[in-house]
Amino acid sequence: MAVFYRRNIDCAALPRHAAAISVPSARRYNPVMSAITLAPHNYAEVIALLEAREWAVCCLCAAWCDVCTEFRSGFDRLALQHPDKVMLWIDIEDRADLVDEFDVENFPTLLIQHGDDMIFYGTVEADEKSLNRLILGRTRDQPTLRSATTTHRLREKLGRLSDGEI
């Protein structure tokens, strides 16, 4: 059973010094890739991808969580099925500076965003087929299925982290 949480989160703290870093154009990135493990060294790459793609799907996990460890390969396969989305693997302990506003109680927890709009946030089963259906269902172009109640400015927050503002 999934538990759903909704919070108003400022997710716009992506490192802004990333603009000064030589980053390959997001168009040059391989459009079919596995999920990206979010880390300070790749904030600029993630910012570029978030600017190039409308959707972000983030799996919030922990390195010590056996369920998360077992699910990682499934999440990577999901990334291959959704090349139009930025698929991020975020360790909530390593990246607490980015996700500290989230109340993650169980793993894995999934966050789906369209731009800055949080479309889905909640604990999910670590089942590839179920998550694929959830992602497809929440990312359709039907506004009634995508009504967001909160925002999370991931790019902006990564920029602030990169600039040392947080």
Annotate each predicted stretch with a short phrase.
Residues 141-166:
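Acidic/histidine-enriched, glycine/proline-rich intrinsically disordered or flexible terminal extensions
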Residues 60, 83-97:
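Thiol-based oxidoreductase modules, predominantly thioredoxin-like and allied folds used
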